[in-house]
């Protein structure tokens, strides 16, 4: 297969690459055959290989970088609250590609970048409230690709998620590999990710010995957390835990504190991002009166992962490995 050896050599032990650009086809993209992909359950045809992709948010941007597609990007938008980007495997991508906005994408900055594809997701850039949607961009002649983790699932007007979160990552890597002519690179990444996760799964506890985990993103009046279709669901399960919100048929959503208390998690995982630091979130949780009887709080079992670890991104396998190592130290009550 084309580029298999190159792709394999570029992969690191974490199945991510630093400084290994994809061997993107150099033929006239305008004359290349159209590519039809299934995206959010719909057949979408792209007439040509995009040259000026604009992305929204860190996980989506790093999917492009992991595929070595920096040269196909016109820029990205994301807040500057995503931690230190100088030590990540895709440092060169961040240095090379223009940071268009520290806010969400808008039609104006997409048009200014002369984008020929927008790669974003529902609540990861796309939003109904001000009309920044794939349909609106289509009217401007700009195609879109929607992050699979964020696909609307039809259970309610805003509920998201149509497949297990890691499967969503593999789907997007495979689809984009096909669109950009880097199928071998995508296949090598997916294979590497699956192997690393399988290695963690093999060490995980089973059955009743699996710690129960609550993902805390933010919120004091009502916590913002992860249901069964958000990336933390599968990150937790592959690491050897059980998401206490597994039965919530949504991706990212709010619940009541009474639900957290009732489900009595053994561990709380904090999503580190935004103006409130992980340490501040931890202090709040450990001192929030309704939680004083919760096992995780009584035993001070709080683990921190970065935002990009917990949204669909090529950092998910590393997050599984780190959380798995922590959960193996937890004695089930």
For each of these PLM feature ranges, what is it?
Residues 2-12, 16-63, 175-215, 327-333:
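Bacterial Sec-exported substrate-binding components of ABC uptake systems
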Residues 57-113, 117-118, 122-126, 244:
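A short, structured surface patch at a secondary-structure boundary
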Residues 59-62, 79-82, 117, 123-127, ...:
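Solvent-exposed loop/turn segments at secondary-structure junctions
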Residues 82-84, 124-132, 142-175, 208-231, ...:
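Extracytoplasmic ligand-binding site segments that recognize negatively charged/polar headgroups
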Residues 163-172, 247-248, 269-333:
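Structured C-terminal subdomain patch of bacterial secreted/periplasmic proteins
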């Amino acid at each position: 297969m084309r580029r298999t050896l190159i792709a394999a050599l570029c992969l690191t032990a974490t199945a991510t690459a630093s400084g290994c650009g994809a061997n993107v086809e150099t033929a006239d993209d305008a004359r290349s055959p159209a590519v039809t992909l299934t995206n959010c359950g719909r057949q979408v045809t792209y007439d040509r290989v995009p040259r000026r992709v604009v992305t929204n948010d860190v996980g989506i941007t790093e999917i492009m970088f992991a595929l070595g597609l920096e040269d196909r990007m016109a820029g990205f938008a994301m807040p500057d609250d995503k931690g230190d980007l100088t030590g990540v495997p895709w440092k060169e991508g961040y240095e090379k590609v223009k940071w268009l906005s520290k806010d969400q994408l808008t039609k104006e900055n997409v048009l200014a970048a002369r984008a020929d594809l927008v790669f974003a997701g529902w609540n990861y850039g796309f939003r109904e409230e001000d009309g920044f949607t794939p349909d609106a961009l289509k009217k401007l002649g700009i195609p879109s690709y929607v992050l699979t983790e964020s696909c609307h699932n039809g259970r309610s007007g805003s509920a998201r998620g149509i497949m297990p979160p890691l499967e969503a990552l593999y789907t997007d890597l495979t689809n984009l590999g096909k669109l950009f002519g880097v199928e071998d690179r995508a296949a090598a990444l997916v294979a590497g990710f699956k192997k690393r996760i399988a290695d963690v799964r093999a060490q995980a506890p089973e059955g009743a010995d699996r710690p129960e985990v609550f993902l805390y993103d933010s919120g004091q009046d009502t916590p913002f957390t992860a249901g069964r279709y958000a990336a933390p669901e599968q990150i937790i399960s592959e690491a050897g835990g059980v998401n206490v919100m597994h039965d919530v048929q949504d991706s990212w959503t709010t619940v009541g504190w009474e639900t957290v208390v009732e489900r009595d998690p053994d561990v709380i995982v904090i999503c580190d991002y935004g103006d409130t630091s992980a340490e501040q979130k931890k202090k709040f949780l450990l001192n929030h009166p309704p939680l004083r009887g919760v096992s995780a709080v009584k035993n001070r079992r709080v683990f921190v992962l970065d935002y990009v670890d917990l949204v669909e991104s090529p950092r998910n396998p590393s997050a599984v490995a780190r959380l798995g190592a922590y959960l193996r130290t937890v004695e089930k009550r």
